[in-house]
Amino acid sequence: MKGNPSTHEVIGTMSTRRFYRWLITIDGDTEINYRNYEELPSRSNYIFFFGGRLRAVKTARPFSLVVLFLILSPMVLFSVFEAHRLWHTRYGYKALVVLFYYAWAWSLLSFTKTATSDPGVLPRNIHMHKDTPQEYFNNVTLPYGAGGSAGNASVTLKYCHTCKIWRPPRASHCSVCECCVLTHDHHCIWVNNCVGQRNYRYFLAFLLSSTLACALLIANCALHLHRALHEGIRVSHRPLPVAVLLCVYAAVLCVYPVILLGYHVAMSGTQQTTREYLRSIGFRNPVMHRIRRRRDNPYAEHGFLRNMLDLMAEPRGPRSCNYRYR
């Protein structure tokens, strides 16, 4: 018959559990009086990593891992088959190689920041009674006194019956993340996170850097092909097929980021988020509609360029939910 576990065994087991909970926290526990990231998974749809430093959304379709693979795979192929030859060529293409690696690293960092950072999550009201007062079902309309081009425009405050809070203007509730987000633009399945006030700039940087990385990859491989063909090397010889593959890969892959980047530049120039734009056109197909400046938009106070800078460079603001606090 086995005896009771010793004190050292109990301490070792508890330390192991704490380490795994620090490494990845999937299911929270409201009874644990430790840090917020150990409790929040039970109230939201988040998974926390490394003691609440990184976070992701629970999903059965991890498209963000596919995007991560699409980012890493061309860099590996380029490093193995192309970089060495271009670096040591007598024509001096070292600058293009360095620029590609810089754009690729920028793209990977921006993707990571977009996917794992806080988009502007608002804390829930956990002290509210389950029965919502009847007056909370009414929206509150306030005058917007900025004196902009929108004239006597107004902003609407809505009560979130899930989070039990009054949402600030431009904030919306995400049904995937199960939380309200400041200046909520949309929930992006490709980064598995919401795009909001605190990570919108990272999202735009990801689109821009991905476009630049694809363009530089095409330039590097095209120069290799051009030089090889002029020197009489057949394309069937190694490693030229890899250069052709990377050119086609980058050309196809850059289409979506270019379209999204142009779309968000137009949206930010008119001071609209994706949710506001879709609501203004009745949630119809946005491809069939031209992005126009809305006259009733209280936030479009300046010209196109100033509006774009105001939305893209909007202050991130302090984090409403610090996941590492007790």
UniProtKB/Swiss-Prot annotation:
GO terms for biological process: protein targeting to membrane. It is found in: Endoplasmic reticulum membrane. The chain crosses the membrane at residues 63-83, 91-111, 203-223, 242-262. It is a multi-pass membrane protein. Residues 84-90, 224-241 are lumenal. Its main location: endoplasmic reticulum. One of its GO terms (molecular function) is protein-cysteine S-palmitoyltransferase activity. Keywords: Acyltransferase, Endoplasmic reticulum, Lipoprotein, Membrane, Palmitate, Transferase, Transmembrane, Transmembrane helix. The active site is at residue 188. Autopalmitoylated. It comes from the Eukaryota. The DHHC domain is required for palmitoyltransferase activity. Interacts with ERF4. The ERF2-ERF4 complex is a palmitoyltransferase specific for Ras proteins. This is Palmitoyltransferase ERF2. It comes from Candida glabrata (strain ATCC 2001 / BCRC 20586 / JCM 3761 / NBRC 0622 / NRRL Y-65 / CBS 138) (Yeast). The gene is ERF2.
